[in-house]
């Protein structure tokens, strides 16, 4: 059975998600939307927005992978150090 995440942590995670979403929306909007003379979204604005989002998602994925790799290396180093310390001389 999965452990429940405390409500305070759920709220914190949701606030972080909203902050990230708002930052991404603002960044892509400012980069992609330049013309306010029409109500319609232009095809180039759609394409730009899609590329902006894809780039952000790929970047986030790469950062997460590097973060995991770093933690694995740190854990291996700690395990090796603990193994050396635990051996009699």
UniProtKB/Swiss-Prot annotation:
Recorded topology in the membrane: Peripheral membrane protein
Source organism, top-level taxon: Eukaryota
GO molecular function: membrane insertase activity; metal ion binding; protein homodimerization activity; protein-folding chaperone binding
Residue ranges that the Swiss-Prot or TrEMBL entry lists as coiled coil: none
Zinc keyword on record: yes
GO terms (BP aspect): protein insertion into mitochondrial inner membrane
GO CC annotation, single: mitochondrial intermembrane space protein transporter complex
Regions that span the bilayer: none
Matching Gene3D superfamilies: Mitochondrial import inner membrane translocase subunit tim13 like domains (1.10.287.810)
Disulfide bonds: 28-52, 32-48
Pfam family, one: zf-Tim10_DDP
Compartments where located: Mitochondrion inner membrane
Residues spanned by motif Twin CX3C motif: 28-52
Quaternary state and interactors: Heterohexamer; composed of 3 copies of TIMM9 and 3 copies of TIMM10/TIM10A, named soluble 70 kDa complex. The complex forms a 6-bladed alpha-propeller structure and associates with the TIMM22 component of the TIM22 complex. Interacts with multi-pass transmembrane proteins in transit. Also forms a complex composed of TIMM9, TIMM10/TIM10A and FXC1/TIM10B.
Family: Belongs to the small Tim family.
Protein name in UniProt: Mitochondrial import inner membrane translocase subunit Tim9
